[in-house]
Structures are given as structure tokens and as C-alpha cells.
């Protein structure tokens, strides 16, 4: 356990030493076909040039998400001025944009408000960072160390970010999605497979919108959701202050 925790700390230190370059790379669209690198189609570059957040202020997570869902259209229009895109690429780019903002949102959240009450338990998140450049992506988006004060123990943790539409019931968390995350986390030594409660899913959808197969699967006991309720309970009162920090950081990537 100590070895794995140290590994997460070392990964976080490595991330901190190249935080700007890491985010620029993660926010660069690699193309839907042939894995070509389209450096010009970059979320960070769009935010600097279009300045969609200029003059904005939100007091809760729902209003923030509605705005993100709105400006994804502006992002695609901006991309179309640079590259010719077909319908599949447009849809993929919208999801890519929301995913980038979602990952950045949660990394910033765990840096500024690293203690959250989830299911009446107090958790502290440390060393949370995105995947490093040399790590293949099979499902885990963020990693870190989580401490459960109720049980007085610290575990390495894996987090998947699904920054999904809280107002759209069509998105469902399934066994296939979470089983890939669980397998990826274990095979890459992001978590200790013998410890419970070390896979977190960060999403904004309804907690009832989960497949029956997932609820009855063996991995269900390993999963903790950080969703609308948890975010509303923990940060809504501090959201204006958090929003200023988030936007300042995004504008300086």
C-alpha cells in the first residue's frame, strides 16, 4: 500500500513539473481517422482566442454545465474554420470538448476543495492528476490518493470522469464502461485490487440511471459516485469563488 501511494505521489510531482504541457497535449484533438495530430484544434487555444468565459459567473454546477453544453457548439464552429469536418467528427469533437472541461474541472476541484462528504463519509483526495503522457488510456482518467477519515485509512484511487448531461436521461452508466475502468486501474497498478472503495466515477447524471447489470455485478461494491448531489452538497456555496479560480487557470493553459 505504501509503495502504491508513493507511486501516485511521484506521478503527481511529475505532472506538476509539466502541468501546462500536459494539459495542452490532453486538450489537442488527435483526429477521428488515422489518428492524425491536429495541433490547431485545441480546446485551450479555443478558450484563449474565443474567450467564451469572459464576463461569466455561476453559482451552481447545473448552470455551469448548461453553459458548457452551449459553448460546445461554438467550439465546433471554431474548429470548422480550421478544418473540414464530417458529422461523425462534429459529434466526437463535442464530446471531446466536454470531456476536456470535465477533467480540468475535477482536477481543479480536488486541488481547491480536496475534502468531500460522500455517502455520509468524509474523503480527502490528494495527488489527483490526469494520465501522464506515456500512459495508455483504457478508462481511467485521473489518479490520486484518497483518505477515508471514517475508517482512518488511505488508498490509491482511480477516477473516471463522465461529464454527462444531467438533463438527458439517454446516457446510462453500464457494466461495460465500469469494467474497463476497473480492469485498467488494476492492470496499471493505479489501485490495490484487495481494497474496497477506490474507484470513483465523476459524473453529472441521475444516480438512478445505472444499468441493472452494473448494480448486480461484483465490481459494484468498488465504485463510489461523485455526482450532482455530492457536488451540490459540497461546493455550491463556494461555487462563485471556485469559478474564478477555474476560469483563471483555464485561461492560462
Kindly label every feature range from the protein language model.
Residues 1-253:
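Mixed-charge (Asp/Glu-Lys/Arg
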